[in-house]
C-alpha cells in the first residue's frame, strides 16, 4: 500500500472516529437536556414555576365526580385530566416507584354537554384550572411523605405563572388518608397500575406494529 493511499485511509478513519465522538456527545447532551426539562423550577420566594408542555406528557386518566351524581355538591365536579412527566413515567415503568422529582399535572375542565352523537353521558366543557403534584422528600415535609400540591388557578386560561404550595389540609391530607401508593391515587388510574414495573409491556408497546 503506497503512503498516499495509507494516509487517505487514515484521514478517513480519523474523520469517522471524530464524527462518532461528536454524535455520542450530542446524544449525551440531548439526554441531559431532556432530563432537565422535567425538573421543577422555583422562584426566589419558593413558588413553583408552572411547567410548559404538560399536554405532551403521558396521559394517565381523567376521573369525574359530577354534581349531578353528588346531590349538586361534588367536592371536585370537573373532569381531572392527569398527566405524568415522561422521565418519571419511564422510571415508574422500570422500578414501580415514583422517582424524586416526579410531577403530575392535573388540568380541570367543566362538565359540558350531557348528550352527544354516541349517547347520553358526560362530555368535556371549558378549561377550568391547572394543578401540579410534585415529589421532593428533601424540600417537603415528612407529614406529606415528601409531596406538595400547587394550584395555578381554578379558572380558565391563562393560568398563573407560579404558585405557592397549598396547605396540607387543602389537598395532601386526603392523599395521606386514601391514596393507594405513595400519595398517588393509583387505584383510580389503571394506566399507572398496568405500567408499574412492567417495562415496555406496561406502556402498551409490543404486539402489532
Model-derived segments and their meaning:
Residues 1-10:
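N-terminal secretory signal peptides that target proteins for export/translocation
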Residues 12-26:
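Bacterial N-terminal signal peptides
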Residues 21-23, 48, 165:
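Short N-terminal micro-motifs specific to bacterial/archaeal maturation
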Residues 27-32:
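Sec/Tat signal peptide C-region and signal peptidase I cleavage site
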Residues 33-35, 40-43, 50-58, 62, ...:
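Sequence context surrounding c-type heme c attachment/ligation sites in exported
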Residues 69-71:
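Acidic, aliphatic-rich amphipathic alpha-helical segments
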Residues 78-89:
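Short, structured beta-strand/loop micro-motifs enriched in basic residues and often containing a Trp
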Amino acid at each position: 500500500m503506497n503512503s498516499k493511499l495509507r494516509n487517505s485511509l487514515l484521514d478517513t478513519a480519523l474523520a469517522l472516529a471524530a464524527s462518532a465522538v461528536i454524535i455520542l456527545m450530542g446524544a449525551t447532551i440531548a439526554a441531559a437536556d431532556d432530563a432537565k426539562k422535567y425538573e421543577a423550577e422555583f422562584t426566589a420566594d419558593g413558588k413553583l414555576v408552572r411547567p410548559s408542555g404538560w399536554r405532551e406528557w403521558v396521559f394517565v386518566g381523567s376521573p369525574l365526580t359530577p354534581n349531578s351524581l353528588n346531590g349538586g355538591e361534588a367536592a371536585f365536579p370537573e373532569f381531572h385530566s392527569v398527566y405524568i412527566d415522561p422521565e418519571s413515567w419511564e422510571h415508574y415503568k422500570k422500578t414501580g416507584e415514583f422517582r424524586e422529582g416526579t410531577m403530575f399535572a392535573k388540568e380541570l375542565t367543566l362538565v359540558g354537554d350531557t348528550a352527544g352523537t354516541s349517547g347520553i353521558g358526560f362530555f368535556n366543557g371549558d378549561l377550568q384550572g391547572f394543578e401540579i403534584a410534585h415529589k421532593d422528600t428533601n424540600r417537603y415535609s415528612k407529614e406529606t411523605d415528601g409531596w406538595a400540591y400547587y394550584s395555578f388557578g381554578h379558572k380558565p386560561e391563562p393560568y398563573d405563572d407560579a404558585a405557592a404550595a397549598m396547605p396540607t389540609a387543602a389537598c395532601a391530607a386526603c392523599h395521606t388518608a386514601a391514596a393507594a401508593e405513595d400519595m398517588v391515587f393509583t387505584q383510580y388510574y389503571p394506566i399507572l397500575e398496568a405500567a408499574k414495573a412492567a417495562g415496555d409491556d406496561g406502556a402498551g408497546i409490543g404486539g402489532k406494529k
